[in-house]
From Swiss-Prot:
InterPro entries: DEAD/DEAH_box_helicase_dom (IPR011545), Helicase_ATP-bd (IPR014001), Helicase_C-like (IPR001650), P-loop_NTPase (IPR027417), RNA-helicase_DEAD-box_CS (IPR000629), RNA_helicase_DEAD_Q_motif (IPR014014)
Residue ranges, annotated region (Disordered): 1-97
Motif DEAD box boundaries: 296-299
Family under the similarity heading: Belongs to the DEAD box helicase family. DDX6/DHH1 subfamily.
Protein name: DEAD-box ATP-dependent RNA helicase 12
UniProtKB keywords: ATP-binding, Cytoplasm, Helicase, Hydrolase, mRNA processing, mRNA transport, Nucleotide-binding, RNA-binding, Translation regulation, Transport
Catalytic activity: ATP + H2O = ADP + phosphate + H(+)
PROSITE patterns (UniProt xref): DEAD_ATP_HELICASE, HELICASE_ATP_BIND_1, HELICASE_CTER, Q_MOTIF
Lineage summary: Eukaryota, Viridiplantae, Streptophyta, Embryophyta, Tracheophyta
Motif Q motif positions after renumbering to this chain: 147-175
Amino acid sequence: MHHPRARYPPGYTSGGGGGGGGGGGGGRGNGGGGFGGGGGGGGGNHGYYGRGPQPQPQQQHYHHQAQQLHQHQQQQQHAQRNSSSQQQQWLRRDQATAAAASGEVAARTAAQLEAVDSSSEDWKAQLNLPAPDTRYRTEDVTATKGNEFEDYFLKRELLMGIYEKGFERPSPIQEESIPIALTGSDILARAKNGTGKTAAFCIPALEKIDPEKNAIQVVILVPTRELALQTSQVCKELGKYLNIQVMVSTGGTSLKDDIMRLYQPVHLLVGTPGRILDLTRKGICVLKDCSMLVMDEADKLLAPEFQPSIEQLIHFLPANRQLLMFSATFPVTVKDFKEKYLPRPYVINLMDELTLKGITQYYAFVEERQKVHCLNTLFSKLQINQSIIFCNSVNRVELLAKKITELGYSCFYIHAKMLQDHRNRVFHDFRNGACRNLVCTDLFTRGIDIQAVNVVINFDFPKTSETYLHRVGRSGRFGHLGLAVNLITYEDRFNLYRIEQELGTEIKTIPPQIDLAVYCQ
């Protein structure tokens, strides 16, 4: 059924073609550069091989004889057959060789053992692994202790999901938090944006859930609806072999739909604090069996608009609940909350410096009226996979998106005053590469992880170092390289100096030519 609506829904501007899935150019191309890093998917079992060459005729003869022997054994006494097959199956290769009296028996035992060996490794060989990510990575994610995911004794089904998601080995924050979370300890973790924090709590949460138990066992709280959708998607992908039911619940969506969904099994609930508290008070969302509460972007969740809801929500949890708090910044509000609800947490601090190592930061002094012209110059000179452009107000977001479209570049926009359905659609399409550029407010700074974004532009310079940190953290995700360009007016100059001092980082003057190696490897 056709619903009458404007030709271009909110968030979509009418100009420029939109940079197609992987590899297509968009609009006027933003100064070239293949889009989205080329074809990912496909490839099947990279780095893994099949079961080896076909057996030679001699081997086939042995296999045939082994089959005949096995059929002959089946006709013997029941107890004898059980004991002999059990014994033969678990003999090790060296024991089998010693025990074998004839070539036929040795071949039969070897064939059985080969089947046992392959079955123990088969699950890895049969995984549908994505193409390996060969881009350069910084120490933010490579400076690990050398652990593997298998070292944590996770369920095999969870390991399958981890590897198929493209995770190869744990990042530093994952190495620190996964084993501690599995012991049941409370955690207060501070790590940079884009270093794998989401998986650091999703993996232990999925490991601890019992799929046979029809109850909400883990709640993950996040500050924005977009982050809730993204986090739930990560949980679904990592846990796709676990038969765990994941639900998202946020404000701005139908309460009736959430109520109906909660009458079905739900093991893991991801959402914003207000909506989850509302459902809990109504008695629809029952948290008496919830053993783990995760707070992602904890500093934002403890802002005045969220903190009362969170404190009320904690009272619905059992006394022995586990609390995990993750954030890049921990202001005073977090310390007060910690003293009240986390008396003895395990503290993880991986913040020797605040900004990501892979992000190169520049500023350009401009007059307000020159900003659009300056942006046009950046588009023509930079090799942009995808860019996020930040403004300080909703009105300026829409105006700038219109200007960018008039310049001939593909552009979406997103802000908090849009309908939730429109926000979801813009977020989904931008993530899937339908467009090169996204103009937005600070709504989009928290935890949003889009790997193809290699350039962030602060069209309006932020007022606080915390906002700056979260904005530039949208590029250079998971140790890859990124570029942050700040357009600075005369009024912004003191803010620029102050933010440099607070973050202990250097924001350099933009050079006439930017080396591709600093943001495109």
